[in-house]
């Protein structure tokens, strides 16, 4: 695929994801209950893989799923979880043994290291791809034949996501299948190329790994780390109060600040931090999952309007250039949404939202503590240079208090 030209971002309605975020169909994966244990989450994942061996090949399984209907062009379709169909009992292993086996698999993947397992399965060939002149050579190291394909886990505008297992190593992954025709129609090939280029080079505990990619005549396949507990946004919605408590919010902000600090050290600006782009792994730890709007900008300030309306900083709305400090603003908005259940500048119309953002006009509900208010106010500064640094976020008294209580 080749880029078709520069990005042209049109402002989306509230809570409607931009094109890059719509491709984050993997974010629909989540456990049946927000209180699921490690064992039940493991068992669920293995059940999704149950019928992989009954297909003649992986392509037939994907083709069958695609025949159920084309991916919806409406972003709301992404919020609908895949239907659960009970697997056949034929040749079904004992549930307790299956659960134990899968739990061991996920733990072994973590202990052994993601890269090592997949690299060994390719007999020494590197699986980490780079967007260089060797793109085709790298991509050809993988094919659909390398994977057992499980059930579809999510559907979005550009394709589907499947739970999958690399045949040789038994390594469990999420396989994002994107339709070239849809990418070309939306003119977002360049965003996909950018996402692959950036995410494949990042190695951090709180950033979802992109192990590699490959493609055929009609589809592009991304081999992604499997985050068993799914999308953080849905986890938040499932809370009785509609938002997280302060202990949990502080832990997530701490983990995200560490990941963003790593990104900024690598000269990567995310530009689209929001709950929908964050996943939870088997242990409940946060993972940044979508880099479609990210840029690698070592020495320049960007002027592109991107991201989600509620999370846009004043400098973007005002048409000014921006740098990595846009992520600091988004972190403040996210912290507020974690604690309140909605973004601080949410309004009935876009014009009013714009006005509130440029005036930094918002209020706190009574239940938000002084410590949390202090952190949010230090991040939501109109002048980017006045925003609290990521090091300051990590060292903030409210964050440290909650982190120490957790440990």
Curated annotation (Swiss-Prot):
One of its GO terms (molecular function) is ATP binding. Residues 1-43, 66-137 are annotated as: Disordered. InterPro entries: Aur-like (IPR030616), Kinase-like_dom_sf (IPR011009), Prot_kinase_dom (IPR000719), Protein_kinase_ATP_BS (IPR017441), Ser/Thr_kinase_AS (IPR008271). Its main location: cytoplasm. GO terms for biological process: cell division; meiotic cell cycle. Serine/threonine protein kinase that contributes to the regulation of cell cycle progression. Involved in meiotic apparatus formation and polar body extrusion. Contributes to Plk1 activation and phosphorylation of histone H3 at 'Ser-10' during meiosis I. Required for accurate progression of early embryonic M phase. Involved in chromosome alignment and cleavage furrow formation during early embryonic cycles. May be involved in mitotic spindle formation and cytokinesis. It comes from the Eukaryota. Belongs to the protein kinase superfamily. Ser/Thr protein kinase family. Gene3D superfamilies: Phosphorylase Kinase, domain 1 (3.30.200.20), Transferase(Phosphotransferase) domain 1 (1.10.510.10). It is found in: Cytoplasm, Cytoskeleton, Spindle; Midbody; Cytoplasm, Cytoskeleton, Microtubule organizing center, Centrosome; Nucleus. Keywords: ATP-binding, Cell cycle, Cell division, Centromere, Chromosome, Cytoplasm, Cytoskeleton, Developmental protein, Kinase, Meiosis, Mitosis, Nucleotide-binding, Nucleus, Serine/threonine-protein kinase, Transferase. Residues 31-43, 126-136 have a biased composition (Low complexity). Its EC number is 2.7.11.1. Changing residue 290 to A: Loss of kinase activity. It catalyses: L-seryl-[protein] + ATP = O-phospho-L-seryl-[protein] + ADP + H(+); L-threonyl-[protein] + ATP = O-phospho-L-threonyl-[protein] + ADP + H(+). This is Aurora kinase. Cdc2 activity is required for activation. ATP binds at residues 157, 176, 224-227, 290. Residues 147-399 form the Protein kinase domain. The active site is at 272 (proton acceptor). GO terms for cellular component: centrosome; chromosome, centromeric region; cytoplasm; midbody; nucleus; spindle.
């Amino acid at each position: 695929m080749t880029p078709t030209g520069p990005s042209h971002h049109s402002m989306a309605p509230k809570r409607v994801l931009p094109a890059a975020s719509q491709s984050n169909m993997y974010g629909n994966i989540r456990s049946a209950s927000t209180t699921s244990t490690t064992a039940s989450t493991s068992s669920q994942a293995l059940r999704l893989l149950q019928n992989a061996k009954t297909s003649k090949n992986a392509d037939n399984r994907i083709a069958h799923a695609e025949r159920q209907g084309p991916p919806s062009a409406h972003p709301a379709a992404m919020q609908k979880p895949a239907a659960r169909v009970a697997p056949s009992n034929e040749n079904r292993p004992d549930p307790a043994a299956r659960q134990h086996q899968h739990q061991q698999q996920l733990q072994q993947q973590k202990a052994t290291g993601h890269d090592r397992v997949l690299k060994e399965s390719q007999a020494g060939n590197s699986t980490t791809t780079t967007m260089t002149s060797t793109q085709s050579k790298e991509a050809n190291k993988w094919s659909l034949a390398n994977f057992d394909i499980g059930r579809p886990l999510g559907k979005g505008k550009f394709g589907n996501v499947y739970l999958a297992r690399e045949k040789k190593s038994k390594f469990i992954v999420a396989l994002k299948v994107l339709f070239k025709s849809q990418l070309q129609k939306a003119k977002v090939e360049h965003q996909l190329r950018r996402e692959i280029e950036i995410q494949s080079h990042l190695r951090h505990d709180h950033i979802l790994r992109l192990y590699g990619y490959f493609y055929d005549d009609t589809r592009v396949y991304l081999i992604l780390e499997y985050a068993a507990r799914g999308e953080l946004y849905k986890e938040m919605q499932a809370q009785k109060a509609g938002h997280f408590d302060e202990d949990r919010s502080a832990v997530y902000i701490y983990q995200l600040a560490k990941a963003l600090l790593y990104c900024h050290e690598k000269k990567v600006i995310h530009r689209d931090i929001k709950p929908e782009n964050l996943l939870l792994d088997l242990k409940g730890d946060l993972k940044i999952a979508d880099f479609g709007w990210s840029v690698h900008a070592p020495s320049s300030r960007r002027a592109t309007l991107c991201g989600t309306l509620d999370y846009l900083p004043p400098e973007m709305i005002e048409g000014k250039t921006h740098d990595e400090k846009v992520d600091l603003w988004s972190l403040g908005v996210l912290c507020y949404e974690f604690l309140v259940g909605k973004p601080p500048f949410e309004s009935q119309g876009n014009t009013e939202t714009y006005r509130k953002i440029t005036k930094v006009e918002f209020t706190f509900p009574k239940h938000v503590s002084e410590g949390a208010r202090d952190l949010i106010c230090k991040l939501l500064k109109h002048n980017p240079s006045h925003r609290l640094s990521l090091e300051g976020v990590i060292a903030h008294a409210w964050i440290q208090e909650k982190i120490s209580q957790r440990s």
